[in-house]
Every structure is written in C-alpha cells, then in structure tokens.
Amino acid sequence: MRDWIPKRGLTSWQSLDKLNTKGDSERMIDSTAAALEAVNDAWTRICHECRSVLGSELHYQAMIYHSLRCDGRVPVDQLGMNVKQWIPNVTSDLFKKLDQSKNESFRGGFEPIPDIVIFSPNVGGDWRRRRADHTMKHMLVAIEVKASERANRRLTYSEIAGDIAKLSAHQEEARVRGYNFTPIMLVIDTAPDPKERITQTTSNDLRALCIELGVEWRYLDPCDDEVQRIGSEHRLTSGNEQDK
C-alpha cells in the first residue's frame, strides 16, 4: 500500500489494510498488446455511452476513461488523463518547430499532453510532470480525443490532423529514447446535425494521414463506429512490448 494514500478519505469502518485498491476484475496489462485488448474490450461501451449524451470534449474523455476502467478493466494506477510530459531536447521536426515558435525564454523542449494514457505497471501510479522520462518509458497506449461540440460548425481537417501529427511526433520522441507506445486518434462525431459532422472526404483524408504516420484511427458517428488499425502488427512487436 502506498504511503501517500490519505487516511482521511476512509470511513470509520475502513482501514488501509482492508482497502482494496485493485478491483477483483482488473486485468494484468504489461504489454502494448494487452493495452490494445483493453481498448477493444471497452469499445462497445464507449460507443454506446458517447452516443447517449451530447456534451463537451472533456466529458467524452471522462466517459472513455470510465469505459476503460469498467469494460477494459484497466487498473486505476495504470490509467491517466491529461498527462503532462515535458520533453527536453526534442528531435522530431514537428516538436522542434513548436518549440521554436515559443518565446525564447520558454524554449528548450515541448510538452505534449495526451488525453488518455494506458501505462505499464512500473509507472507505479505516478505520472506527475516531474517524472516525465519515467512516464514516457512506461506508456503503452496514448489516445487523443476530438469531439463535435460546436454550434453550426464541424471539426476541420486541420484540427484533427494536428493531433494526429502530434501523436506521431510523440511516438518518434519515445522511440529515439528507446521506448515505444501505440498512438490512437479517437473522433467522437455524434452531433445530430449532419452539418456539424466531418465530411466523408475529410474522413478519408484523415484515414490516409493515419496510414502515413502510423496512428490508429477510431471514428464514431451517430450510427456507425469505425476502427482502422494502421500497421498494428509492426507496432505490437516494437519497443515497449513488455514492462521493463
């Protein structure tokens, strides 16, 4: 039991010794393959629950997190949201460009913030910003979420493509350091008005970009859900396949 779990959060009839922080149904996730299996197991619930309400992008992220905990059975100490990860001395072209675009006094690296991350067990339930390299080492899956939530506007190609490019650059930074993870772009496009959803042409172009950059594409509209795994066989045998 970690000594930083606050006792004040327990009721009078509970004790730290009896508190079960590992649910009985939680699974062992120590590889990229196991993390992707958890995402697949959660996918039906993600589709159902994200179609059941209309809300903000942040709300959909929370629903995806909930689905990964429930049906994906991802342990609580291996599932992070909005994970800040400062990367000094970036090597990818995109992150170099983004670093140089900042005020000179703030240069020296770039900080991607994946919406949802599944980690290997050795992350130890601690993915604070101060542990950036440790956090990167133990990433298995990183998910970026985009949702159609604007009135009289649809998501644009550039908005989603920007996140796809950042996922790819983040993976490149990890690989340079001897790590690896699978990047996933998940688009919740459930707006009831077709004029507020991306066009088929945009969808096709985004899928093509995912193929080019090696990012898994998942798309959900009000009727159909689409999963396109890009180069998954290569990714599943690369880098952080087993927890180290």
Predicted regions and their residues:
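Non-catalytic C-terminal interaction segments of nucleic acid-processing enzymes
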Residues: 6, 18-20, 24, 194-244
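Nucleic-acid nuclease catalytic cores
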Residues: 171-201
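Mg2+/Mn2+-dependent nuclease catalytic core
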Residues: 137, 148-171
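Short acidic, S/G/P-rich loop/turn micro-motifs used as interaction or catalytic elements
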Residues: 123-125, 148-153, 191-196
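Conserved catalytic cores of phosphodiester-cleaving nucleases, focusing on short active-site segments
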Residues: 116-120, 139-149, 167
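Active-site metal-binding core of divalent-cation-utilizing nuclease and nuclease-like domains
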Residues: 77-136
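Charged, often low-complexity linker/regulatory segments
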Residues: 4-71
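Surface-exposed cleft-lining segments at the edges of enzyme active sites
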Residues: 47-53, 103-105, 147-155
